[in-house]
Amino acid sequence: MYSMMMETDLHSPGPQTNTNPGQTGPNSGSKANQDRVKRPMNAFMVWSRGQRRKMAQENPKMHNSEISKRLGAEWKVMSEAEKRPFIDEAKRLRAMHMKEHPDYKYRPRRKTKTLLKKDKYSLAGGLLGGAGGGVGMSPAGVGQRLESPGGHGGSASAGYAHMNGWANGTYSGQVAAAAAAAAMMQEAQLAYSQHPGSGSHHHHAHHHHPHNPQPMHRYDMTALQYSPISNSQSYMSASPSGYGGISYTQHQNSSVATSAAIGTLSSLVKSEPNISPPVTTHSRGPCPGDLREMISMYLPTGESGDPSVQSRLHALPQHYQSTTAGVNGTVPLTHI
């Protein structure tokens, strides 16, 4: 229907211009005719003049746009024989117009109203799609924060958020808050990985990188499974491939160091399958108090009393301190 109305507007000056002299008075109509020469009516306009007046008398409350839609639909279903007299009349009017105005050239006026209306609708559609009723705004911002430290632009981050389904506004406020916390942890991880180091950087990264991704992947598990608490087995099976594929391949300079780190990590996980990674990462070396509290908030409490876990936790900080002492003599994560 909208395309038919556009065709009508393209072929003719519009039905409103014909009724202007009757509505505003003869003086203003004559002034308008003196200033601007109207285009000759096409066949549809010749036919719709009488039909529009008739339909307006039958339905006085009907809007003009609805009348135009109905007239356009009627004109399309009419046969060529029914259209023929109106086509001939339009040709006669065009010939008369060419005689009266031989130097006439059609100069289309700027349709500022239609352009503004289209821009308004497109803007509203974009806001509805991006905001999703107000809930999806913060996940979209999280997508930007996740992508911006890596050097991507705003358009890429918007596409990233849409691809992952964050911007449809169907998630609850708790998931949005979880995503915001995950973005903070991702920023901390990226800032730490860009910290300058020496040749033993891959050992250092291997022992300290799991501090950051663990809460982020825990949020991912809750978002995917729609459950408040994810069990440790599914978490353990999902986390090595998750951050092993992302953090190591993105932040290590050597592929040999990458494969060695992943191999060590997989053997570490396979050797003790009953111990979840969050417990081991909780006591790995010195880290800031707020980060430790943030991680320990999501740890299962029942496994911390296991004696094998305690002996392993006592051995890990010594190994961590011996490996991190060679990296420029600095304590990691103090700049976050």
From Swiss-Prot:
The keyword Nucleus belongs to this UniProt entry's keyword annotation: yes
Q: Where is the composition biased (Basic residues)?
A: 200-211
**Tissue expression from the record:** First detected at the tail bud stage in the forebrain. At the 3-somite stage, also expressed weakly in the hindbrain. At the 12-somite stage, strongly expressed in the forebrain and weakly expressed throughout the central nervous system. At the 21-somite stage, also expressed in the lens.
Ranges where the record places region Disordered: 1-39, 193-216
For this protein, the record's InterPro entries field holds: HMG_box_dom, HMG_box_dom_sf, SOX_fam, SRY-related_HMG-box_TF-like
SMART domains recorded for this chain?
HMG (SM00398)
Single GO molecular function: DNA-binding transcription activator activity, RNA polymerase II-specific
A GO term from the CC aspect: nucleus
What's the record's remark on domains?
The 9aaTAD motif is a transactivation domain present in a large number of yeast and animal transcription factors.
- Chain positions of motif 9aaTAD: 293-301
User: Where would you find this protein in the cell?
Assistant: Nucleus
Q: What is this protein called?
A: Transcription factor Sox-1a
Instruction: List the Pfam families hit by this protein, alphabetically.
Output: HMG_box (PF00505), SOXp (PF12336)
Compositionally biased tracts (Polar residues): 14-32
Keywords (alphabetical) are: Activator, Developmental protein, DNA-binding, Nucleus, Transcription, Transcription regulation
Main subcellular location of this protein, as a coarse class:
nucleus
What is the role of the protein in this entry? Transcriptional activator.
Record Gene3D superfamilies: High mobility group box domain
Tell whether Cell inner membrane is among the UniProt keywords: no
Residues annotated as DNA-binding are 37-105
Instruction: Specify the species.
Output: Danio rerio
| GO process annotations (BP) | brain development; determination of left/right symmetry; negative regulation of transcription by RNA polymerase II; neuron differentiation; positive regulation of transcription by RNA polymerase II
